[in-house]
A protein has these predicted regions:
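Residues within well-formed alpha-helices
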Residues: 18, 22, 46-49, 115, ...
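Histidine-centered phosphotransfer motif of kinases
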Residues: 38-56
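Bergerat-fold GHKL ATPase/HATPase_c domain
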Residues: 1-41
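Short glycine-rich, polar/acidic loop-and-turn segments at beta strand-coil junctions
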Residues: 23, 43-45, 75, 86
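Generic leucine side-chain signal with a strong bias for well-ordered alpha-helical environments
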Residues: 9, 27, 46, 51, ...
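Conserved beta-strand-loop-beta-strand hairpin that lines the nucleotide-binding pocket
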Residues: 1-4, 51-143
Length: 143
């Protein structure tokens, strides 16, 4: 079985809550709600990173980009992928081993790596600018 769903997210931090709600609704519809906690944490971190790092501080919160951040959820063959598209071409970088994990910020990709089975990113090409950062979750057998 394969399925996909996506939503546009406004360039405001309130979008993180909307992304979690969208994820909850989608996973429930796909009958894989038992993975919600891990997936929601990862989605929250990916969306927060997109909003914090991909949009410059001087970007108006109602920026005309349509949309500046987009969440995609894709399910197929025992896998779930959460992908967040943003307008920045900058490479996402996880905190290096030995860095201060007690700091208030900077742990997002470490959490993504810890709670997903794998993660990565790729630049967008063509008319789309920016990148997609994704996380993969292996699912138990589901119809």
């Amino acid at each position: 079985m394969s399925s996909s769903a996506s939503c546009a997210l406004p360039a405001r931090y309130e979008a993180v809550r909307g992304a979690r709600q969208f994820t909850s609704t989608t996973l429930t519809q796909w009958n894989i709600g038992e993975r919600f906690d891990d997936v929601a944490l990862v989605v929250s971190e990916l969306v927060t990173n997109a909003l914090r790092h991909a949009l410059p501080a001087d970007t108006p919160r109602d920026h005309p980009l349509d949309p500046p951040v987009r969440l995609h959820l894709m399910r197929w063959a025992g896998r779930l992928v959460c992908a967040v598209r943003d307008p920045s071409p900058d490479t996402p970088t996880a905190r290096a081993a030995g860095e201060d994990f007690a700091a208030e910020s900077g742990r997002g990709l470490f959490l993504v790596e810890s709670f997903s089975d794998s993660w990565g990113w790729h630049p967008l090409a063509g008319a789309l600018h920016g990148k997609v950062v994704w996380a993969l979750f292996r699912l138990a057998d589901h119809p």
